[in-house]
């Protein structure tokens, strides 16, 4: 309100309506039973709060150090085995382990247990396409499940060979997957 010549003038701010709809789309996935398997790679601990920015940096450092000649990075393995809510997890840049090869210094092997995995395809440039699907899995898909629940503290990213795409893993058609272990409720 403003006073003009002793009288009050009223101003009406226009009403704005904001509507936000979430969900309402079909998440593509398949259930796949996989035997246990062993991966080899480099492992580092991260905070969930900073993971979205620091894990892409971990990948960048991996290749800058020349570690891509040992492990090209077929998998990104999120390991939170105790699932204790500590706010941290271990992340491994890994390949399937070939027992005929030596394990380079600074690398480890990790056995991934047998599970039924919900496998989600991701299409698009990294890391945004993968992070978008991952967010939908944990904020919308998992909470809405009626028949299954999260089975263990693993989340695996599987990456296609980037050399098959004109713009590598930044290509709009780049393919990757997210694997989530599930079990019947």
Residue spans for each PLM region:
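A solvent-exposed interaction/effector surface
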Residues: 2-185
């Amino acid at each position: 309100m403003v006073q003009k010549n002793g009288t009050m003038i009223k101003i009406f701010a226009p009403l704005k309506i904001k509507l936000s709809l979430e969900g309402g789309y079909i998440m593509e996935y398949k259930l796949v039973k996989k035997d246990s398997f062993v991966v080899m790679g480099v492992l580092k601990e991260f905070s969930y709060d900073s993971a979205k920015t620091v894990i892409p940096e971990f990948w960048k450092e991996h290749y800058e150090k020349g570690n891509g000649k040992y492990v090209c990075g077929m998998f990104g393995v999120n390991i939170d085995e105790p699932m204790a809510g500590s706010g941290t997890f271990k992340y491994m840049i890994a390949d399937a382990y070939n027992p005929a090869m030596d394990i380079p210094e600074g690398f480890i092997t990790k056995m991934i247990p047998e599970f039924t995995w919900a496998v989600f395809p991701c299409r698009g440039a990294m890391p945004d396409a993968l992070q978008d699907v991952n967010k939908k899995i944990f904020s919308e898909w998992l909470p809405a499940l009626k028949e299954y629940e999260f089975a263990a503290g693993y989340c695996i990213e599987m990456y296609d060979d980037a050399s098959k795409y004109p713009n590598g893993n930044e290509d709009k058609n780049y393919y990757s997957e997210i694997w989530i272990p599930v079990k019947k409720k």
